Regions:
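NUDIX/MutT-family hydrolases
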Residues: 99, 109-143, 147, 156-164, ...
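N-terminal strand-loop-strand
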Residues: 6-44
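Core subunits and conserved enzymes of cellular information-processing
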Residues: 1, 5, 23-25, 30-31, ...
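Long, intrinsically disordered, low-complexity Ser/Thr/Pro-rich regulatory/activation regions
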Residues: 197-230
């Protein structure tokens, strides 16, 4: 196809925006930063960047995630493309959004400081630039659907955790209290947890037994799915 075919078409930018979610034992948090450049300088934004020459959209998202977290090969999944004509006040930009689930304890303060970034509770989100609030809302909707058919938690929780911590994570995702008995019945049916001979005594004198995921069984359910609707 000749170059003239492309010359008559409008040129625009392609960007990626990353919804980086973490869990602090109580609530879901998202990583935000204040923009240091125009347009909308000084306002809160998701982590993102433009797709560079010679890289795919997936590679761009992976690069942004590694740069913003200092962690390689993070789980990520595409949410969708956002291309409203007037979404960016600077130029015509189409953005492809990805979400990633991370353990907040893996982040160093230096990484956050270098990007002027901070963890913000989902329940306390400020007004973000462009359509970034919509991207987060769409991510939460996807996460709820995923939680109903796939195990979630491996990327968000520490290696060892209590059952109350795991239930609190699901309650944060579903944004509603869950019945303890029904929740544990579902977990037992999946058989993805290994009980450890260690107790966490931070929350009570008796303490709660710690568990860890059986990675092989966990990945099996990730691949084939499971009815975990609560």
């Amino acid at each position: 196809m000749s170059a003239a075919f492309y010359q008559d078409e409008v040129k625009f930018y392609v960007a990626v925006d990353c919804i980086i979610l973490g869990f602090n034992n109580k609530e879901l948090n998202v990583l935000l930063y204040k923009r240091s450049f125009e347009s909308m300088k000084g306002q809160w934004s998701l982590m993102g960047g433009f797709v560079k020459s010679g890289e795919s959209v997936n590679e761009a998202a992976s690069r942004v995630l590694t740069d913003c977290t200092g962690i390689e090969h993070l789980f990520m999944e595409q949410i969708g493309a956002y291309g409203d004509v007037s979404r960016d006040l600077g130029e015509r930009v189409i953005s492809v959004a990805y979400y990633s689930l991370v353990n907040m304890n893996d982040f160093s303060p230096e990484i956050l400081e270098s990007h002027n970034a901070t963890w913000t509770k989902i329940s306390e989100l400020p007004d973000l630039i462009f359509d970034h609030n919509q991207m987060i809302n769409d991510t939460l909707s996807v996460l709820k659907k995923k939680a109903a058919s796939r195990p979630i938690g491996f990327n968000l929780l520490p290696e060892q955790f209590t059952l109350p911590q795991l239930q609190t994570l699901y309650e944060a995702i579903y944004q509603t209290p869950l019945d303890k008995r029904n929740f544990r019945k579902k977990l037992n049916a999946m058989d993805i947890l290994e009980k450890l001979d260690i107790k966490d005594k931070k929350s009570s004198k008796r303490g709660a037994f710690l568990y860890k995921f059986n990675e092989k069984k966990y990945n099996k359910w990730v691949e084939q799915g499971f009815d975990f609707s609560l």
